[in-house]
Amino acid sequence: GIAKQLGLNLIIIDNETPGKAENERITPEILAPYLSDDVALVTLEVIQYRSGARNDIKSLTDLVRKHGAFMLWDASHAVGAIEMDFDKNGVDIAVGCTYKYGNSGPGSPAWLYVNKKVQAELQVPIQGWFSQGDQFAMGPVFEKAEGIRGFQIASPSLIGLRCIKSAFTMIEEACIGAISEKAAIGTEMMIQLYDAWLAELGFTLLTSRNPQERGGHISLGHPDAARICVALREFADVIPDYRTPDSIRLAIAPLPTSYVEVWDGFARIRDLVSSRQYEKIEKTDSRVT
């Protein structure tokens, strides 16, 4: 991509190989060896998409900034589920989607956060007419608009924006603090039900037991994860997520999901797996269910 075009090096941290990082969580100790004065940009997820591990925003951002680099956070699996407080934690740039805990549906517009302190020095790689100072000048030279408008590209979907407005109005009314608290309680409930019902059925917990180290979903491992996910949809009316090679993601959407639904969902998982009903499903090579 961009790194190749500009002759830059893209370095990927291996946090997925067993033993490299607990629950795939990136810590300052893991990140530090990769940092030097020639690093320009570091990008990490607030919540690891597969395991549900929560990275510490402030400590990692502070570490990156000490080396003179920018820190870009992907908050797709965090926004609408946990408190992030970008200003307090000194975040430079963040991006994310709105179709997860943003409750706005597939295809809804993504979002970009750029701290006011760095808006003037950063440029957009795609110079669209929405980021042009004079939108209708259509001249030969691009002049970036001041402020956050200088980072827009083109017309967003109005229908998608309407969904976002409705969904985020509800999030604001409910208060992200209360939503984050419910996510912590809901995931704790899931872990307790895993201990009580699922551990003896061949499942393993792939997410931290510490509520400060997870978000709104947990991940369970099972050798037959792919077939179990399909069977849960077809036979039990439970909608999980499968991620290769053997992970099942289970989330509480704090706004609409009740604790009773969490209990019932895990009871259905227990019953389906203990009865081996999932064996009716032929093996699938689907990477996502």
Regions found by a protein language model. Give the residues of each.
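Pyridoxal 5′-phosphate
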Residues: 1-289
